[in-house]
Amino acid sequence: MVKIIGKGGANYVLAFGNDNDDLYRICVRGRSLRENNRSTVDNYHYALEVVKPQLGEFVCRMELVDLPVCDSLRQVLKSKIEVWDATTVTCLKMPNLVPAGSLSHTVDHFTKIHIGERAIVWEFKPKWLSGNDKYCRNCTLNLLRGQTSISYCHAQLLNPGQAGPILKSLFAGLNVPPAFIEDMEAYIAQPCSVLQRLRVAQEQVDASLGPLDQPDTAASPERCLSMTLKDVSCFVSWHKDASPVAVVVDLDMKPAAKSAHWTALQEQLDRFQPQVRH
């Protein structure tokens, strides 16, 4: 039996049978299975050869595997794949980062928490952590999109003294022990934390880029890497008697064809009012 664990615009994440340890990430961006298989291979090499030098040990362990096309795979993928022009489905096999039997809570558009008997996993998309002297890109975009219920951004967690209050507010009403909040606050402040490392990586890549409205950089490989780093997902696993462990996923190369969209959105944000500053 095949179960869909997660759906995105370009990928499905599947589980097979009673195997709770491994998940299989399949590209569904194109209508052709062969095309999607090639994209999966390309994304695998991109993650290891381009993104991993930026994020190091935080990059999730993964391997390429080919699964024979079967009826159950056809069933779960039929709404996305129209042309079955290959006999196997190429997948990224990855560890399941959510504890078996845990209770999952969607906190908001960017944050989930998974509470298990022995571990708590904080899942989040930090988005833009690199600096913008004019306004907060994350919070201003939330207002532009009408997401007014989200009163924080992950960039604020890196400001001294703000992580604790934000985390307490974020997980209020959920069954998380005070030690989880305390340990996460201390972890975020460490130079080796995933948020700190991701911010440094974003800043280093962005330092070589001009404004988004410059045609020579809007679709460059460096711009695509910058956008990949701003759309990753982080999983931070917490155990009571151990240091937090972080893993980063969603490392696909962003298509250069989106450069016009990136430029238009940036221009829209620059005109939008009110812009959020903090």
UniProtKB/Swiss-Prot annotation:
GO terms for cellular component: nucleus. InterPro entries: Ins_P5_2-kin. Keywords: ATP-binding, Kinase, Nucleotide-binding, Nucleus, Transferase. Transmembrane segments: none annotated. It is an enzyme of class 2 (transferase). Coiled coil: none annotated. It is found in: Nucleus. GO terms for biological process: inositol phosphate biosynthetic process. The keyword Metal-binding does not apply. GO terms for molecular function: ATP binding; inositol-1,3,4,5,6-pentakisphosphate 2-kinase activity. It holds the Pfam family Ins_P5_2-kin. The keyword Kinase applies. Its EC number is 2.7.1.158. Has kinase activity and phosphorylates inositol-1,3,4,5,6-pentakisphosphate (Ins(1,3,4,5,6)P5) to produce 1,2,3,4,5,6-hexakisphosphate (InsP6), also known as phytate. Belongs to the IPK1 type 1 family. This is Inositol-pentakisphosphate 2-kinase. The lineage of its organism: Eukaryota, Fungi, Dikarya, Ascomycota, Saccharomycotina.
